[in-house]
Amino acid sequence: MKEVRLRTSSEGIPTLRRSLCCDGVIFDVMAGLGNQLFQYAAARATSLRLGCPLYLNIDWFDRYTDRELALNAFKIVGTLFRGTKWEKFRDRNYPRLAPRVEYLGNDIDQRIFAAQPGMRFMGNWQSEVYFRAFTQQIREEVSLSVPLSENSRRVIDQILSRSAVAVHVRRGDYIADPATSKIYATCAPDYYQRASAKLREMVSTDVTFFLFSDDIDWATQNLKFLGNCIPVDCNGRNRPWEDLALMAACNHNIIPNSTFSWWAAWLNPNPNKIVISPAVWYIQPNMSNRNIVPNNFITV
């Protein structure tokens, strides 16, 4: 059997040293929590389909410090490793690890379904198409392995005591980063007005909106039309999985074009949930991803 040799780093995460190939599939993990979950789900589904081990390369987080690995807050299955940067495998002392499939586009990349052990993948994989065959298992593994904070437990009690709707407002780098703002459309207040009106039409009971945002002051000021609304601002950037769990605990979800709240809505276990999503996620029409919004989400 082909083998990846691992040694434990000072943080307890194995470090890849040398290997000609490996007995499993290797997926790169990068970016924020929403993208990390898409990458894990596609990776895990691939390893299940092949019946082989899963190795998750987390070197990206050593190079980009504005994001943190959050997968270890979940019950994921696989080996996390970091170590020699991939380009060093060109050196004679570090033979090339595996053939790489790199895909950051928006259509379904069929190459992943022809994966073989020993291959390495880097991509976003932003569609449930990649893991739909293993939905229940992915749901079980993408559940928290760490307890919620006391503040989050108090919010959960509020959520469970009423008909709750999670509303997520994504601004952050969509506004502040010029490169990102050229790619992603920003959901304006009129989107949330239309989405909340649509949801109220479909729900017979009075609802309470729980408002989540990376700019909670702006969201509170500009979404006053929601009416019965509770802003949630108790976790910050260091524990994003807590906000994700709180949004998933609501009865219904209104999401922007954000993979973070996409996962909260997808993980929502309510069989009668209503999820409202924007129809447009990208500014450029040629970047449109028709596969990112599941069939049971409603677009406005």
Please name every model-derived segment:
Residues E201-P285:
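Donor-binding and catalytic core of enzymes assembling or modifying cell-surface/extracellular glycoconjugates
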Residues Q36-L48, Y192-S196:
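Histidine-anchored nucleotide/phosphate-binding helix
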Residues I26-A31, K182:
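Active-site rim elements
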Residues V4-L16, L20-D23, R63-D206:
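Secretory-pathway luminal glycosyltransferase catalytic domains
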Residues C52-R63:
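A short beta-strand-loop structural module common to alpha/beta enzyme folds
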Residues V29-F38, T65:
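A short, glycine/small-residue-rich beta-strand->loop->alpha-helix junction that serves as a flexible
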Residues Y64-I76, A219-G227, M287-I292:
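Short, aromatic/basic amphipathic alpha-helical patches
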Residues L6, I283-V300:
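Leloir-type glycosyltransferase catalytic cores
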